Every structure is written in C-alpha cells, then in structure tokens.
Amino acid sequence: MIATQRPFPIPSPVPLAPSSTVLPTTVPENAPEHCPGVESSQAGKADACEGCPNQSVCAEGPKGPDPDLPLIRERMSSVRRKILVLSGKGGVGKSTFTAGLSWALAADEECQAGIMDIDICGPSIPLLMGLESSTIHTSASGWSPAYALDNLAVMSIGFLLPSSSDAVIWRGPKKNGLIKQFLKDVEWGDLDYMVVDTPPGTSDEHLSIVQYLKEAGIDGAVLVTTPQEVALQDVRKEIDFCKKVGIPILGLVENMSGFVCPNCKNESQIFAPTTGGAEAMGKELGIELLGKVPLDPRIGMTCDQGMSFLDEYPESPATMAYLDIVQRIREILDDE
C-alpha cells in the first residue's frame, strides 16, 4: 500500500477528536511538487508557483499569522530543552545516534525525555525504540505518544502506518501539516529534553520544524557525521543551513569512529579520516567536537531488537562515548 497525497487514513485503533484532522488541506490537487501551501506567505510568489494554474488565486488570497503558532508555543512551553539531530548525508547513523542519545538521557530516572521523529518518509525510530507494534490513541488533551520507558515518550509517523513497509509519498505541505500536528496536538507533558530526529540533508521537514519551533525556542542542533570526507562535505552544508536559519550548533558527533572488537575491546580504524575527520573540521570552523562514537557491531543488533545498547553493554567504549556526549550537551545547555 502507498500513502499518497490524499488525506491520510489513520488506522482504526486511533480515533480522532472531532476538531482535528490528520492533515490540513493546504495544497490543491493540481499543485506543483514544491507548492508552499495556500496558507503560506509565499503562496503564489515562490519559484515553484510559476506556471501553476492556481498562482493568481493563491497570490491574492488573504494572508495572516499562522493561527496554530500560539498553540504550538503553548504546547511546547512544557518542554524545557529542544535538540535537533541533523546529518548532511543518509547512512551516517543519525537515527541510531538519536536513539542512543535518548536512551542515555532517560537513564536518569529523574529526567523526562521525548523523541519526535520527523523523518516522514523514512521513520526508523519505532524499530530502534522497540515500539513497532505501538499505536497512537487520542483524548481530549491530544494524541498520546508511545513510551519506550516510563520517562521516554516517542512520536513517529511509523505509528500511523498500517504496515512498516508502506511508503509515504507526500509533497512538502502534507509533511509540514503532520509535523505541525506532532507539535500542537501531541500530549507531550512536562519534558526536560525533546530530541528531534530529522531526515538527512536540508528539506521541507527542516524548514518546517525551524519555522514552527522558532518562537518556542530551539536550544541547538547536534550534527552527526562519519570520518570520511564524503560525509563531512555534506555536514558543511548542514552547518551553513543552521547559520542561515539561526539554529545554535551544540557540536559535532563523529559516528562509526573506529571499530571496537567485542572480545578484546581493541579499537581499529575502518573508515579512515583522510582529511582529519570531524575533529579537524570542527577546529577549522570553530565548532566543538562533542565526541566520537566507535563502531560496535552489537549496536546494530540491539537496534534491530529495539533495545538500549547502553543498558545491554555498559562496558563498551561506545556506551562511554554516548554518556560523555550527553554530559557535555547538558553542560553546554546549563551554561546558557
């Protein structure tokens, strides 16, 4: 089954409140691929609008402040820290790092943490957190997230798909509408940290989360890369994106930084940092290297099983790296 541009059908276990719909109808059926949506201030003016039969109608339509922004601001007021996890390229372990970071935060029972998965077309967080069979329910106060732990809430489009193999093929406005609902309609409760897992690159999802969270406050972004120059090159673009939209950069994380033998614990290089890796790039650009997470094959195994690698293998150098990174992030945010 393929999810298309039609309004998204929620599985039957998830009743919706009468006042809410899953996706707003903000894009005409015959709109171009990158339509900004009829409610956008760029409606009828963006480059994507050229040649669209609706261009003049959209350009002349009434524009005003987004009425949902105050609702988002109110909902997010109960979230103390909001952290984006970004990567310039897919396959560097961004979602795996998001899961590890969240497990590490939630290891403190006094800490309330949450994951918002806005990788709309490739949601892997449900699998990584052991929540593939979870469904979302709604109440008068909004959608209830799934819980990996009592103090670790998770929301993902993966919970709304009939099958984990279903493709999501949506234009930008449809994705934006769902992200907005994750922000304003999910009953997150009081959180100390919200970790936002984003798609690779700089896409509609990134622009949406920045736009919607701007007033509520984004505390910063963690950029994940591997040691190779092909990954670092795209991280430079991600850094440029953060600077242009005003997102503070908390620091870099070099993932798959060497290989740790599960038996002898010795570490060896697999992906050689031919240009110095994240450490050299951080020094060049004045961005802190938060840490290096070595490649432990047991990380992949625990991810497939939806288990916390940190709990299962506390003696691993990778676990130590995660805990050090979390400690450094806390120090940076507490100093602000």
From Swiss-Prot:
Gene Ontology molecular functions: 4 iron, 4 sulfur cluster binding; ATP binding; ATP-dependent FeS chaperone activity; iron-sulfur cluster binding; metal ion binding
The UniProt entry's GO biological process terms, in alphabetical order, are: iron-sulfur cluster assembly
Q: How is the cofactor bound?
A: Binds 4 [4Fe-4S] clusters per heterotetramer. Contains two stable clusters in the N-termini of NBP35 and two labile, bridging clusters between subunits of the NBP35-CFD1 heterotetramer.
**Sites where the protein binds [4Fe-4S] cluster 2:** 261, 264
A Pfam family cross-referenced in the UniProt record is ParA
Which residues bind [4Fe-4S] cluster 1 per the record?
Answer: 35, 49, 52, 58
The cross-references to InterPro entries, in alphabetical order and at most eight, read: Mrp-like_CS, Mrp/NBP35_ATP-bd, NUBP1/Nbp35, P-loop_NTPase, YlxH/NBP35
Localization of this protein: Cytoplasm
Cofactor(s) the protein needs: [4Fe-4S] cluster
Q: Which UniProt keywords apply?
A: 4Fe-4S, ATP-binding, Cytoplasm, Iron, Iron-sulfur, Metal-binding, Nucleotide-binding
Binding locations of ATP: 88-95
Q: CDD domains from the xrefs?
A: Mrp_NBP35
| Region annotation Disordered: where it falls in the sequence | 1-20
Q: Spell out the GO cellular component terms annotated for this protein, sorted alphabetically and separated by semicolons.
A: cytosol
What does it do?
A: Component of the cytosolic iron-sulfur (Fe/S) protein assembly (CIA) machinery. Required for maturation of extramitochondrial Fe-S proteins. The NBP35-CFD1 heterotetramer forms a Fe-S scaffold complex, mediating the de novo assembly of an Fe-S cluster and its transfer to target apoproteins.
The entry describes its oligomerization and partners as: Heterotetramer of 2 NBP35 and 2 CFD1 chains.
The text of the family note is: Belongs to the Mrp/NBP35 ATP-binding proteins family. NUBP1/NBP35 subfamily.
Checking HAMAP family in the record gives:
Mrp_NBP35, NUBP1
- Name the UniProt record assigns to this protein: Cytosolic Fe-S cluster assembly factor NBP35
